[in-house]
Design a protein with these regions (language model features):
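Mobile, glycine/GP-rich and aromatic-enriched active-site lid/loop segments adjacent to catalytic centers
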Residues: 93, 100-152, 160, 228-377, ...
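Glycine-rich active-site loop/strand segments that organize a redox cofactor
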Residues: 56-88
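Glycine-rich loop(s) and the adjacent beta-strand/alpha-helix scaffold that form part
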Residues: 184-243, 378-391
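Long, amphipathic alpha-helical stalk/connector segments used for oligomerization, subunit docking
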Residues: 397-479
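Glycine-/small-residue-rich beta->alpha transition segments that form the dinucleotide
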Residues: 40, 181, 185-190, 369
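N-terminal Rossmann-like FAD-binding beta1-loop-alpha1 element of flavoenzymes
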Residues: 10-36
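Core beta-strand elements of the Rossmann-like FAD/NAD(P) dinucleotide-binding domain
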Residues: 5-8, 171-181, 359
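Glycine-rich FAD pyrophosphate-binding loop
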Residues: 28-50
Length: 560
């Protein structure tokens, strides 16, 4: 492989929502050189690639940031970092205003005020939200973007980050990137579990299939402390299209009903996990399928829904048109997705302080990869990108010298990369191992197949089988650098799977139905587990760390 060494002040891994905004923030507030590495292309990468039709985190009139903290805390049944939620919430409106100035169309009423959707949301025309961010980044001073570069590991020495390693998916260049500070913004993890739709349509999922948990995996391997991986996220979505349901529930007030026409959502509770659990239970007890009731809405609401889904999930609009019946003439069937690990909706991710500093010195995290702060959505990811960006600048300014990446470290990672670029032909492919991994997680770690439920014996089997699959990855081969990326993605997912299993096993209670439904411990246990379940990889094994909650008014700082 051809090799190239690059030096920069701040390396941002991931050019999605948080990554782009971190770059903009650094550019506008310092003269630091910024390098964004994105394995796709920042114009259409990350969770915003297809667009969105609402900003789900905004402090509307007569509300305050603490109200949003309280909402997120209630939805997660207390397992949140209130200090992180508050520092995020205080920036939500500021970053929204900035987005509008960059060109995002936010709908307004006749008085010029934002059109709200519920207590925390704004309606937008957001199909082009990611190109808007990408264009701003391309115009920013001192910011360079390397598209189609896959970063696969950090360079960490004595718990301090010195940069990262990657390769060009199209160029085939092996990159050693030295940086004074690194911001990880690679999103969450999809593809761990078997998805709703099989075969050719398996990509039809709620979370981007290209978000493979790379940031989580690199942090886990480097010994960073992680938090709350047991709080998986399962999205309640329109059946088959896996289109969002919030547009229906909040946009036209559609209630969850069973096949008998009974409204069941209030029977189980209205938190995110309870809405999924209720749907699963109604189906199990023979009252399915379940729907969002749209029959009888107005023609104007019909038109509004058709347009809204074009901004985010056009397949749902196409499905209505293809059937010849608008939503006013047919209820929308719903189902739960496979579980994901995503710190923008639940609290899974890096254990960080209020500066979004991880437990590895010089490494900061923002967006879905950062833990403790659920219900971020778009604006929360922007807010965390800003916080991480400013913190990285402050960190660099506080240091007098920075260590270089050693030749030994570079040569080791180069050898580990090149070993897959051979002409050997094993008995199995990367895709086959990925499908095997998803089958294991689906069957033994609480996937769709088991209605998201698991017991400790199943988790033990899952852990054993995932470790077996991990050993098989050493024999894989890649004909080109695209296939090499697929191998990296598989290894990332397997690393994350092991942490998910360890966390599910460690929380010996059921606090969130469906999200973490432990059949051996079916009740909530506030006495023992009204706490964070954290973990750190030590000597090749996952060590569980139980930490007390950081509650209102407290501020956590890394100390041990």
């Amino acid at each position: 492989m051809k090799t190239e060494k690059i030096s920069t002040d701040v390396l941002i891994i991931g050019g999605g929502t948080a990554g782009c905004y971190a770059a903009l923030t650094i550019s506008e507030n310092s003269d630091k050189k910024v390098l964004i590495c994105e394995k796709a292309h920042i114009k259409r990468s990350g969770c915003l690639a297809a667009g969105v039709n609402a900003l789900n985190a905004y402090i509307v009139e007569d509300r305050k940031p603490q109200d949003y903290v309280d909402y997120a805390k209630k939805d997660a049944d207390g397992i949140v970092r209130e200090d992180l939620l508050l520092t995020m919430s205080e920036k939500l409106n500021e970053v929204t205003d900035r987005l509008e100035k960059l060109g995002l169309v936010i709908l307004k009423d006749e008085n010029g005020k934002y059109v709200t959707r519920g207590n925390r949301n704004l309606k937008i025309n957001g199909e082009n939200i990611k190109p808007i961010l990408a264009d701003a980044v391309e115009k920013a001073k001192n910011v360079t973007v390397l598209n189609r570069v896959n970063i696969f590991d950090y360079s960490v020495k004595d718990n301090k980050i010195n940069g990262a390693f990657g390769f060009g998916i199209e160029s085939g260049i092996f990159y050693t990137i030295e940086a004074k500070a690194v911001i990880i913004a690679t999103g969450g993890a999809a593809g761990l579990y078997k998805p709703n739709n099989p075969g050719f349509s398996r990509h039809k999922m709620w979370y981007p299939p290209f978000n493979t948990g790379a940031g989580y995996a690199m942090g886990i391997r480097a010994g960073a402390e992680m938090t709350t991986f047991e709080m998986r996220f399962i999205a309640l979505r329109c059946k088959d299209t896996i289109a969002p349901t919030g547009t229906l529930a909040q946009g036209v007030g559609a209630k969850q009903i069973n096949s008998l026409g009974e409204v069941y959502e209030t029977k189980y509770g209205l938190t995110t996990s309870e809405r999924v659990y209720g749907t699963v239970n109604e189906n199990q007890e023979g009252r399915g399928p379940c729907y969002l009731r749209t029959e009888g809405i107005t023609a104007e609401q019909d038109e509004s829904l058709l347009k809204a889904y074009l901004n985010m999930a056009p397949s749902q609009t196409i499905k209505w048109i293809e059937s010849g019946r608008n939503p006013s003439r047919q209820n929308v069937e719903i189902e739960g997705t496979e579980p994901y690990i995503v710190g923008g909706h639940t609290a899974s991710g890096y254990w960080v302080d209020t500066d979004r500093a991880t437990t590895i010195e010089g490494l900061f995290a923002g967006g879905d990869v950062a833990g403790g702060c659920p219900q971020k959505y778009v604006t929360g990811a922007l807010a965390e990108g800003e916080i991480a960006g400013l913190s990285a600048v402050k960190y660099i300014d506080s240091k007098e010298s920075f260590e270089k990446i050693s030749d030994e470290d570079t040569n080791y990672h180069l050898r580990e990369t090149e070993k897959y670029l051979t002409d050997r032909h094993p008995l199995y492919t990367t895709e086959q191992l990925e499908e095997a991994m998803q089958t294991v997680m689906d069957s033994y770690a609480g996937g769709i197949k088991t209605n998201y439920r698991f017991n400790e014996k199943q988790l033990d089997i899952a852990d054993c089988k995932i470790r077996q699959l991990e050993t098989l990855t050493d024999d894989l081969y890649a004909e080109d650098f695209q296939e090499l990326m697929y191998i990296c993605e598989l290894k990332e997912r397997l690393t994350v799977c092991k942490s998910v299993i360890a966390h599910l096993r460690a929380r010996k209670e059921t606090r969130w139905h469906s999200f973490a439904e432990n059949l051996d411990y079916p009740e909530k246990d506030d006495r023992s587990f009204n706490k964070y379940v954290n973990s750190r990889l030590e000597n090749g094994e996952i060590k569980i760390i139980i930490r007390d909650l950081v509650t209102g008014g407290e501020k956590y700082e890394h100390s041990n």
